[in-house]
Amino acid sequence: MANAREAAVKTLYKIEYEDAYSNLALKEQLAASDLDTRDKAFVSALVYGAVQRKKELEYIISSFSKIKLKKISKYILIILKLGIYQLLYMDKIPASAAVNESVRLARRYGHASSAGFVNGILRNVDRNRGNLPKPADRLEAIAVKYSFPEWLVSRWI
């Protein structure tokens, strides 16, 4: 599944930073890969899950990181999102696999210190899995939980 995770990183990068449509970017990436059916399903689940929970994943990263999101390398931010998504929402993926593969990807796509940064954030999230930080403001909490913009949530409440 190592290649599958890298395919997910590349796909999410295109979606977030090259304004690609998620379905088209995923279809293109999967067509170009030699992944088997199971790995393609894994990539799809990772990409669509990270897209769906983008705001929540970013909130978690910002809660555990001393570095602001805008200062984190684009690839490292994507690797963190995918790693956290695996830890929190993919029950069949062992935490050790999610962390170790994310660290391996961080070594490949980041600086020397990136691997330690990713390892620290993911292990901290895993340790605090049952007690993750939540926004104090009700409006922001709903926006983060469902990954909707706050202005839209304010119209519904």
Predicted regions located by residue number:
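Class I Rossmann-like S-adenosyl-L-methionine
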Residues: 1-157
